[in-house]
Amino acid sequence: MAFIKFNKSELVNIAYSLKREILCANKTGAYCNTSILTCNTRRYHGLLAVTLDRFGGDRYLLLSGVDESLVVKGKQFNLGIHCYGDIYEPRGHKYIVDFSADPVPQITYKVGEMLFRKSILLAQDRDQVLVKYELLSSPAPAKLVLKPFLAFRNTHSLTYQNPDANTKGNAIQGGMAFRMYANFPDLNLQVSDSKAKFIEEPYWNNNITYSDEYRRGFDCREDLLVPGWFECSLKEGGSVVFSASLSQEETAGLKRRFTSGVKAIGEITGYRDQLRRCADSLITDHNGRKKISAGLTWMYTGLLRETLVSLAGLSLYGLDSPKMFEEILDNLIADQQERLFRRTTQVEAPLYMACTLQDYIDYGADEKAVWKKYGVIMRGIIESYLPG
């Protein structure tokens, strides 16, 4: 039985289901975040947002989403859903009959006599999201159409149709590579079906509305580029895996990578296990430097006060790792010299260092060893307040 599950009556109720979200984060600083209907309601929502060093280490949303359609006997069923002002179109949520999230988000659709499932996996050690599509049952073969929606923007911003965007892609193994603007990395979109084809007919999907932003009174509309679409053939019992990645992948191995990725995550065993997983998801290891994300998906990584307040709870009592505690703390000290010892707008933030070190000692660390390593840091912090 799935640990997290929603039924059809809950899922087709937009007022209910749009407030429930999928949130996956990995060690590279990437995330996948959307509603359980895969209808984005906030500017931060999307299938793949990544941390880019070339832009100061901020997160950038590259792939906003993918709209799926099933074509059977010449009839097309659109499974996607977007908000345009007060209108939702297409209304693919009406086909959803089940949602579970153990160990990865799975959405099941029933279209006539067809049963179709979508599973989403964010790779844990690379900037890649994998989506597996399975035709569980069907009276006839089906064509699967996948339309990617590209953003290529900072997660805090919105984007609009403009003449500077490069709407063309380059053919790669099993798909296409897109780079909408200079200095961005390529976004490689590929599918595991060797016979699939990509129809390159770019157009802008305008005035997509993010309902949560609208409710808060923020800018809430943007335009997203649809560069074309994939067409794949599916038979009953068949599957295809879609990959969006900063690296070009071997498409023959996409199904194996998805299967091994799901296996590595494992099933959720209870609330404590789920809490530990959430704690671990807040700790990034981008470029081999561990830091704490202050909050997914809109807050930053490696903030002074937020790291000091949460460090002991996450690394010691959550993950039982003194080594991780010291590694994150050492990285914080190296990165926050100015705010620790000279100038900060959060006047109390450096003083949390004392609380954090005391938490470490209470956990079981040797107090003399802690003072030997971090005593000079505490002295420096206290002395920084002397000038007033």
Task: List the model feature ranges, each with a label.
Residues 1-267, 305, 316-320, 333-334, ...:
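Terminal accessory carbohydrate-recognition/targeting modules of carbohydrate-active enzymes
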Residues 107, 280-299, 333-343, 386-388:
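Glycine- and aromatic-rich loop/turn segments at beta-sheet edges
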Residues 125-128, 232-234, 298-309, 344-355, ...:
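Aromatic- and histidine-enriched alpha-helix N-cap/loop-to-helix transition segments
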Residues 251-300:
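An acidic-aromatic substrate-binding cleft motif
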Residues 267-279, 361-388:
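Active-site acid/base region of carbohydrate-active enzymes
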Residues 298-332:
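Alpha-helical support elements that line or immediately flank enzyme active sites
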Residues 312-316, 355-365:
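Short glycine/serine- and small hydrophobic-enriched flexible loop segments
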